[in-house]
A protein has these predicted regions:
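Phosphate-handling DNA/RNA-contact segment within nucleic-acid enzymes
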Residues: 1-18, 24-28, 32, 50-51
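TOPRIM fold recognition
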Residues: 24-33, 38, 43-95
Length: 95
């Protein structure tokens, strides 16, 4: 399991996948693993979606895995895809 986790982390780093997270603590946790291409949801959702769509054509969305986090993930993923951004779920599915 730990080896798989490290493999996924290395993949995110080498592919330089943009990751969208809910807050600063999430960002800091990913930073501690060497992941730096991160955006936090610190502005209105539509603004984040537009910013991501301008910056990349593929990103990962790592929201909390509770009920609210799953609802946020669904909304964010849907909006991003409507703006032409492919959602990379490899790491989220691993978790």
């Amino acid at each position: 399991m730990e080896e798989d986790f490290q493999k996924h982390i290395r993949s995110l780093i080498t592919e330089n996948v943009l990751i969208v997270v809910e807050g600063v603590k999430d960002k800091n946790a990913l930073n501690s693993f060497g992941i730096t291409n991160i955006i936090t949801l610190n502005s209105p959702l539509f603004s984040v979606v537009e910013h991501v769509a301008e910056k990349t054509k593929e990103c990962g969305v790592l929201t909390d895995l509770d009920k609210e986090g799953k609802k946020l993930y669904a909304k964010l993923s849907s909006d991003l895809q409507r703006h032409g951004v492919k959602i990379n779920n490899k790491f989220r599915n691993f978790l």
